[in-house]
Protein backbone atom coordinates (compact mmCIF):
# COMPACT_ATOMS: atom_id res chain seq x y z
CA UNK A 1 0.00 0.00 0.00
CA UNK A 2 2.96 2.33 0.58
CA UNK A 3 6.54 2.03 -0.60
CA UNK A 4 9.43 1.70 1.88
CA UNK A 5 7.03 0.50 4.61
CA UNK A 6 7.34 -0.21 7.45
CA UNK A 7 8.66 3.14 8.67
CA UNK A 8 7.90 6.18 10.81
CA UNK A 9 8.59 9.75 9.70
CA UNK A 10 8.59 12.81 11.97
CA UNK A 11 8.41 16.33 10.61
CA UNK A 12 9.03 19.65 12.40
CA UNK A 13 7.99 22.28 9.88
CA UNK A 14 9.15 25.17 12.08
CA UNK A 15 12.75 23.94 11.82
CA UNK A 16 12.42 22.28 8.37
CA UNK A 17 13.60 19.03 9.96
CA UNK A 18 12.57 15.51 8.94
CA UNK A 19 13.55 12.41 10.92
CA UNK A 20 13.00 8.95 9.44
CA UNK A 21 13.00 5.57 11.18
CA UNK A 22 13.12 2.79 8.58
CA UNK A 23 13.73 -0.97 8.45
CA UNK A 24 12.80 -1.89 12.02
CA UNK A 25 14.36 -5.03 13.48
CA UNK A 26 10.85 -5.89 14.67
CA UNK A 27 7.45 -4.33 15.27
CA UNK A 28 5.71 -4.59 18.63
CA UNK A 29 1.95 -4.51 18.04
CA UNK A 30 -0.84 -5.11 20.55
CA UNK A 31 -4.52 -5.72 19.83
CA UNK A 32 -5.48 -7.29 23.19
CA UNK A 33 -4.85 -6.41 26.83
CA UNK A 34 -2.46 -9.34 27.23
CA UNK A 35 -0.50 -8.26 24.14
CA UNK A 36 -0.50 -4.66 25.39
CA UNK A 37 0.97 -5.56 28.79
CA UNK A 38 3.59 -7.77 27.15
CA UNK A 39 4.31 -5.17 24.46
CA UNK A 40 5.09 -2.45 27.01
CA UNK A 41 7.63 -4.76 28.64
CA UNK A 42 9.13 -5.56 25.24
CA UNK A 43 9.44 -1.86 24.39
CA UNK A 44 11.09 -1.16 27.77
CA UNK A 45 13.56 -4.01 27.26
CA UNK A 46 14.46 -2.78 23.77
CA UNK A 47 14.97 0.75 25.10
CA UNK A 48 17.24 -0.45 27.90
CA UNK A 49 19.08 -2.54 25.31
CA UNK A 50 20.11 0.63 23.46
CA UNK A 51 17.46 0.63 20.72
CA UNK A 52 15.36 3.49 19.36
CA UNK A 53 11.58 3.14 19.57
CA UNK A 54 9.10 4.89 17.24
CA UNK A 55 5.39 4.45 16.69
CA UNK A 56 2.02 5.15 18.26
CA UNK A 57 -0.41 4.35 21.04
CA UNK A 58 -4.16 4.54 20.34
CA UNK A 59 -6.53 6.50 22.58
CA UNK A 60 -8.26 3.32 23.82
CA UNK A 61 -4.96 2.09 25.28
CA UNK A 62 -5.56 4.71 27.97
CA UNK A 63 -8.46 2.63 29.25
CA UNK A 64 -6.05 -0.18 30.08
CA UNK A 65 -4.11 1.97 32.54
CA UNK A 66 -7.20 2.26 34.76
CA UNK A 67 -8.90 -0.92 36.00
CA UNK A 68 -12.28 0.84 36.07
CA UNK A 69 -12.00 1.78 32.38
CA UNK A 70 -10.37 -1.41 31.07
CA UNK A 71 -13.65 -2.95 29.79
CA UNK A 72 -13.98 -0.02 27.35
CA UNK A 73 -10.89 -1.11 25.36
CA UNK A 74 -12.27 -3.31 22.58
CA UNK A 75 -9.84 -5.99 21.46
CA UNK A 76 -8.78 -7.11 17.97
CA UNK A 77 -9.82 -3.94 16.15
CA UNK A 78 -8.40 -2.80 12.80
CA UNK A 79 -6.40 -0.15 14.62
CA UNK A 80 -4.07 -1.73 17.19
CA UNK A 81 -3.90 -0.48 20.75
CA UNK A 82 -0.27 0.27 19.99
CA UNK A 83 2.33 -0.35 17.31
CA UNK A 84 6.00 0.50 17.81
CA UNK A 85 8.99 -0.24 15.62
CA UNK A 86 12.34 -1.16 17.18
CA UNK A 87 15.19 0.56 15.33
CA UNK A 88 18.98 0.72 15.56
CA UNK A 89 19.01 4.46 14.79
CA UNK A 90 17.26 7.12 12.71
CA UNK A 91 18.01 6.68 9.01
CA UNK A 92 20.56 9.09 7.55
CA UNK A 93 19.63 10.93 4.31
CA UNK A 94 16.74 8.58 3.62
CA UNK A 95 14.74 9.16 0.38
CA UNK A 96 11.57 9.41 2.48
CA UNK A 97 12.88 12.71 3.88
CA UNK A 98 12.77 14.29 0.41
CA UNK A 99 9.59 16.30 -0.24
CA UNK A 100 7.31 14.66 -2.77
CA UNK A 101 4.64 16.32 -4.91
CA UNK A 102 1.28 14.77 -5.66
CA UNK A 103 0.89 13.75 -9.31
CA UNK A 104 -2.87 13.13 -9.16
CA UNK A 105 -5.30 15.83 -10.24
CA UNK A 106 -8.12 14.79 -7.92
CA UNK A 107 -8.00 15.58 -4.18
CA UNK A 108 -6.29 13.04 -1.95
CA UNK A 109 -9.43 12.94 0.21
CA UNK A 110 -12.84 12.88 -1.46
CA UNK A 111 -16.46 12.66 -0.33
CA UNK A 112 -15.86 14.00 3.20
CA UNK A 113 -18.88 13.50 5.43
CA UNK A 114 -19.31 14.41 9.08
CA UNK A 115 -20.23 11.41 11.19
CA UNK A 116 -22.85 13.50 12.99
CA UNK A 117 -25.11 16.15 11.51
CA UNK A 118 -25.94 19.07 13.78
CA UNK A 119 -29.09 17.47 15.19
CA UNK A 120 -27.11 14.41 16.33
CA UNK A 121 -24.33 16.63 17.68
CA UNK A 122 -26.83 18.72 19.63
CA UNK A 123 -28.38 15.64 21.28
CA UNK A 124 -24.97 14.44 22.46
CA UNK A 125 -23.94 17.95 23.43
CA UNK A 126 -27.13 18.28 25.51
CA UNK A 127 -26.46 14.97 27.29
CA UNK A 128 -22.93 16.12 28.05
CA UNK A 129 -24.22 19.49 29.24
CA UNK A 130 -26.51 17.68 31.66
CA UNK A 131 -23.46 15.97 33.15
CA UNK A 132 -21.80 19.39 33.47
CA UNK A 133 -24.84 20.85 35.22
CA UNK A 134 -24.93 17.89 37.61
CA UNK A 135 -21.26 18.38 38.46
CA UNK A 136 -20.20 15.00 37.06
CA UNK A 137 -17.37 16.76 35.21
CA UNK A 138 -16.20 20.33 34.62
CA UNK A 139 -15.09 19.91 31.02
CA UNK A 140 -15.17 17.12 28.43
CA UNK A 141 -13.69 16.98 24.95
CA UNK A 142 -16.53 15.80 22.71
CA UNK A 143 -15.35 14.51 19.31
CA UNK A 144 -16.94 13.13 16.16
CA UNK A 145 -15.56 11.31 13.12
CA UNK A 146 -15.33 12.63 9.57
CA UNK A 147 -15.37 9.87 6.94
CA UNK A 148 -13.86 10.17 3.46
CA UNK A 149 -12.26 8.17 0.64
CA UNK A 150 -8.56 8.37 -0.12
CA UNK A 151 -6.48 7.62 -3.20
CA UNK A 152 -2.95 8.20 -4.43
CA UNK A 153 0.37 8.32 -2.59
CA UNK A 154 0.09 8.86 1.21
CA UNK A 155 3.64 10.23 1.42
CA UNK A 156 2.96 12.85 -1.26
CA UNK A 157 -0.30 13.69 0.49
CA UNK A 158 1.59 14.16 3.76
CA UNK A 159 3.89 16.70 2.12
CA UNK A 160 0.93 18.51 0.56
CA UNK A 161 -0.68 18.83 4.01
CA UNK A 162 2.49 20.54 5.22
CA UNK A 163 1.90 23.29 2.66
CA UNK A 164 -1.65 23.74 3.93
CA UNK A 165 -0.81 24.01 7.64
CA UNK A 166 2.77 23.89 9.00
CA UNK A 167 3.11 22.35 12.49
CA UNK A 168 5.89 21.22 14.84
CA UNK A 169 4.74 17.67 15.59
CA UNK A 170 3.82 16.13 12.24
CA UNK A 171 4.24 12.40 11.66
CA UNK A 172 3.57 9.68 9.10
CA UNK A 173 3.32 6.16 10.51
CA UNK A 174 3.38 3.05 8.31
CA UNK A 175 3.63 0.14 10.75
CA UNK A 176 0.77 -2.22 11.66
CA UNK A 177 -2.80 -1.03 11.28
CA UNK A 178 -3.84 1.96 9.18
CA UNK A 179 -1.36 4.44 7.75
CA UNK A 180 -1.44 7.56 9.95
CA UNK A 181 -0.95 11.08 8.62
CA UNK A 182 -0.64 13.35 11.65
CA UNK A 183 -0.52 17.14 11.41
CA UNK A 184 -0.54 17.78 15.14
CA UNK A 185 0.42 21.17 16.55
CA UNK A 186 0.29 19.82 20.13
CA UNK A 187 3.13 18.35 22.17
CA UNK A 188 1.96 15.58 24.51
CA UNK A 189 5.28 15.35 26.35
CA UNK A 190 8.99 15.46 25.81
CA UNK A 191 11.84 14.36 28.04
CA UNK A 192 15.37 15.79 27.78
CA UNK A 193 18.72 14.14 28.55
CA UNK A 194 18.61 15.45 32.13
CA UNK A 195 15.24 13.84 32.84
CA UNK A 196 13.06 16.95 32.69
CA UNK A 197 9.60 16.24 31.31
CA UNK A 198 7.50 18.96 29.70
CA UNK A 199 3.95 18.95 28.35
CA UNK A 200 2.18 21.65 26.33
CA UNK A 201 -1.60 21.31 26.75
CA UNK A 202 -3.55 23.08 24.02
CA UNK A 203 -7.07 24.20 24.85
CA UNK A 204 -8.91 27.20 23.42
CA UNK A 205 -9.44 27.85 19.71
CA UNK A 206 -10.42 30.89 17.63
CA UNK A 207 -10.53 31.35 13.83
CA UNK A 208 -7.93 33.50 12.08
CA UNK A 209 -8.80 37.04 11.12
CA UNK A 210 -8.65 38.46 7.60
CA UNK A 211 -5.93 40.99 8.50
CA UNK A 212 -3.06 41.36 10.96
CA UNK A 213 -5.15 43.87 12.90
CA UNK A 214 -8.04 41.41 13.19
CA UNK A 215 -5.64 38.67 14.30
CA UNK A 216 -4.21 40.92 17.01
CA UNK A 217 -7.70 41.74 18.26
CA UNK A 218 -8.71 38.05 18.29
CA UNK A 219 -5.57 37.07 20.23
CA UNK A 220 -6.15 39.85 22.76
CA UNK A 221 -9.75 38.72 23.18
CA UNK A 222 -8.65 35.09 23.69
CA UNK A 223 -6.17 36.08 26.38
CA UNK A 224 -8.80 38.06 28.27
CA UNK A 225 -11.74 35.70 27.71
CA UNK A 226 -12.74 34.02 30.98
CA UNK A 227 -14.25 30.96 29.25
CA UNK A 228 -11.09 30.30 27.21
CA UNK A 229 -8.87 30.82 30.25
CA UNK A 230 -11.06 28.53 32.37
CA UNK A 231 -10.90 25.76 29.74
CA UNK A 232 -7.13 26.02 29.57
CA UNK A 233 -6.59 26.29 33.32
CA UNK A 234 -8.67 23.15 34.01
CA UNK A 235 -6.41 21.12 31.74
CA UNK A 236 -3.25 22.71 33.14
CA UNK A 237 -4.35 21.73 36.64
CA UNK A 238 -5.18 18.21 35.44
CA UNK A 239 -1.76 17.80 33.83
CA UNK A 240 -0.01 19.23 36.89
CA UNK A 241 -1.70 16.45 38.86
CA UNK A 242 -0.85 13.77 36.26
CA UNK A 243 2.78 14.77 35.89
CA UNK A 244 3.30 14.96 39.67
CA UNK A 245 2.73 11.18 39.85
CA UNK A 246 6.12 10.50 38.22
CA UNK A 247 8.19 13.58 39.12
CA UNK A 248 10.21 14.90 42.04
CA UNK A 249 8.46 16.99 44.69
CA UNK A 250 9.24 20.70 44.37
CA UNK A 251 10.22 20.63 40.68
CA UNK A 252 6.79 21.26 39.13
CA UNK A 253 6.54 24.55 37.24
CA UNK A 254 4.23 26.28 34.74
CA UNK A 255 6.66 28.44 32.72
CA UNK A 256 3.94 29.53 30.26
CA UNK A 257 0.25 30.08 30.97
CA UNK A 258 -2.33 31.21 28.37
CA UNK A 259 0.15 31.66 25.52
CA UNK A 260 -1.38 31.84 22.01
CA UNK A 261 0.07 30.11 18.94
CA UNK A 262 -1.08 31.06 15.45
CA UNK A 263 -1.64 28.65 12.55
CA UNK A 264 -2.96 29.25 9.01
CA UNK A 265 -6.62 28.68 9.96
CA UNK A 266 -6.81 29.06 13.75
CA UNK A 267 -5.29 30.56 16.90
CA UNK A 268 -4.72 28.08 19.77
CA UNK A 269 -4.18 28.79 23.46
CA UNK A 270 -1.35 26.71 24.94
CA UNK A 271 0.35 26.45 28.34
CA UNK A 272 3.52 24.66 29.44
CA UNK A 273 3.94 22.34 32.46
CA UNK A 274 7.43 21.12 33.45
CA UNK A 275 8.97 18.90 36.16
CA UNK A 276 11.90 16.53 36.87
CA UNK A 277 11.21 12.81 36.44
CA UNK A 278 11.88 10.50 39.36
CA UNK A 279 15.05 8.40 38.84
CA UNK A 280 14.62 5.21 36.79
CA UNK A 281 11.04 5.98 35.78
CA UNK A 282 9.92 3.37 33.25
CA UNK A 283 8.19 4.17 29.95
CA UNK A 284 5.01 2.40 31.08
CA UNK A 285 4.93 4.50 34.27
CA UNK A 286 5.06 7.74 32.28
CA UNK A 287 2.20 6.65 30.04
CA UNK A 288 0.18 5.30 32.98
CA UNK A 289 0.45 8.71 34.67
CA UNK A 290 -0.20 10.93 31.65
CA UNK A 291 -2.01 9.00 28.90
CA UNK A 292 -4.22 10.02 27.23
CA UNK A 293 -3.45 13.72 27.39
CA UNK A 294 -5.93 15.63 29.54
CA UNK A 295 -6.53 18.16 26.77
CA UNK A 296 -8.42 15.48 24.79
CA UNK A 297 -10.37 14.01 27.70
CA UNK A 298 -11.59 16.60 30.20
CA UNK A 299 -11.70 16.97 33.95
CA UNK A 300 -11.92 15.07 36.19
CA UNK A 301 -10.12 12.83 33.74
CA UNK A 302 -11.50 9.38 34.54
CA UNK A 303 -15.11 10.54 34.85
CA UNK A 304 -14.81 12.54 31.63
CA UNK A 305 -13.50 9.46 29.81
CA UNK A 306 -16.46 7.42 31.09
CA UNK A 307 -18.94 10.04 29.88
CA UNK A 308 -17.26 10.37 26.48
CA UNK A 309 -17.28 6.60 26.00
CA UNK A 310 -21.04 6.72 26.59
CA UNK A 311 -21.63 9.64 24.17
CA UNK A 312 -19.25 9.03 21.28
CA UNK A 313 -20.39 6.63 18.55
CA UNK A 314 -17.24 4.52 18.37
CA UNK A 315 -13.58 4.28 19.35
CA UNK A 316 -11.24 7.16 18.58
CA UNK A 317 -8.46 4.72 17.64
CA UNK A 318 -5.22 6.56 16.76
CA UNK A 319 -6.92 9.96 17.07
CA UNK A 320 -6.20 11.53 20.47
CA UNK A 321 -3.57 8.88 21.12
CA UNK A 322 0.13 9.70 20.85
CA UNK A 323 2.79 9.34 18.13
CA UNK A 324 6.45 9.67 18.96
CA UNK A 325 9.90 8.26 19.58
CA UNK A 326 12.16 7.21 22.44
CA UNK A 327 15.96 7.46 22.19
CA UNK A 328 18.46 5.20 24.01
CA UNK A 329 19.64 8.18 26.14
CA UNK A 330 16.15 8.72 27.55
CA UNK A 331 15.10 11.57 25.27
CA UNK A 332 11.44 11.16 24.28
CA UNK A 333 8.94 13.17 22.26
CA UNK A 334 5.28 12.36 21.63
CA UNK A 335 2.56 14.43 20.06
CA UNK A 336 -1.12 14.46 20.90
CA UNK A 337 -2.53 12.75 17.80
CA UNK A 338 -5.09 15.40 16.91
CA UNK A 339 -5.51 16.43 13.26
CA UNK A 340 -4.60 12.86 12.41
CA UNK A 341 -5.99 10.88 9.47
CA UNK A 342 -6.23 7.07 9.46
CA UNK A 343 -5.95 5.51 5.98
CA UNK A 344 -7.27 1.96 5.58
CA UNK A 345 -6.33 -0.45 2.75
CA UNK A 346 -9.86 -0.48 1.29
CA UNK A 347 -9.78 3.28 0.58
CA UNK A 348 -11.54 4.44 3.74
CA UNK A 349 -10.16 7.50 5.52
CA UNK A 350 -11.26 8.64 8.97
CA UNK A 351 -10.30 11.62 11.07
CA UNK A 352 -11.98 13.08 14.13
CA UNK A 353 -12.59 16.65 15.19
CA UNK A 354 -13.80 18.00 18.49
CA UNK A 355 -13.45 20.52 21.26
CA UNK A 356 -13.68 21.07 24.98
CA UNK A 357 -17.22 21.59 26.27
CA UNK A 358 -17.75 23.60 29.47
CA UNK A 359 -20.86 24.90 31.23
CA UNK A 360 -21.27 28.03 29.09
CA UNK A 361 -20.43 26.39 25.73
CA UNK A 362 -22.99 26.72 22.90
CA UNK A 363 -23.74 23.76 20.63
CA UNK A 364 -23.81 25.82 17.40
CA UNK A 365 -20.42 27.43 18.07
CA UNK A 366 -18.84 24.12 19.07
CA UNK A 367 -20.12 22.33 15.97
CA UNK A 368 -18.81 25.14 13.76
CA UNK A 369 -15.44 24.87 15.51
CA UNK A 370 -15.34 21.15 14.69
CA UNK A 371 -15.90 21.88 10.99
CA UNK A 372 -13.26 24.62 11.11
CA UNK A 373 -10.73 22.16 12.52
CA UNK A 374 -11.52 19.72 9.69
CA UNK A 375 -10.01 22.15 7.18
CA UNK A 376 -6.52 20.82 7.96
CA UNK A 377 -7.50 17.71 5.97
CA UNK A 378 -9.99 18.85 3.33
CA UNK A 379 -9.18 22.53 2.89
CA UNK A 380 -12.20 24.46 1.67
CA UNK A 381 -14.03 21.37 0.39
CA UNK A 382 -17.65 21.08 1.50
CA UNK A 383 -18.20 18.53 4.27
CA UNK A 384 -21.51 16.70 3.84
CA UNK A 385 -23.62 16.26 6.95
Model-derived features: where do they sit?
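Extended alpha-helical targeting/anchoring segments
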Residues: 1-385
Amino acid sequence: MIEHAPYVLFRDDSENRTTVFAEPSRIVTARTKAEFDHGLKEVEAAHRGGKWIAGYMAYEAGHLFEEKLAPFAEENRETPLMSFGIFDAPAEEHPLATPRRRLENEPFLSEPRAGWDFSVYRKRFDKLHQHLRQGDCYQANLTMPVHARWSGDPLAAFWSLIERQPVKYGALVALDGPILLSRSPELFFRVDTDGWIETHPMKGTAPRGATAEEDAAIIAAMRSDEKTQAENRMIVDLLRNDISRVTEVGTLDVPKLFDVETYPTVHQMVSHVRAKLLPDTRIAEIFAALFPCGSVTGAPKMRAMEILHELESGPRDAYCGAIGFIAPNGVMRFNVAIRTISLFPDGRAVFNVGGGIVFDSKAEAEYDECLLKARFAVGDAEIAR
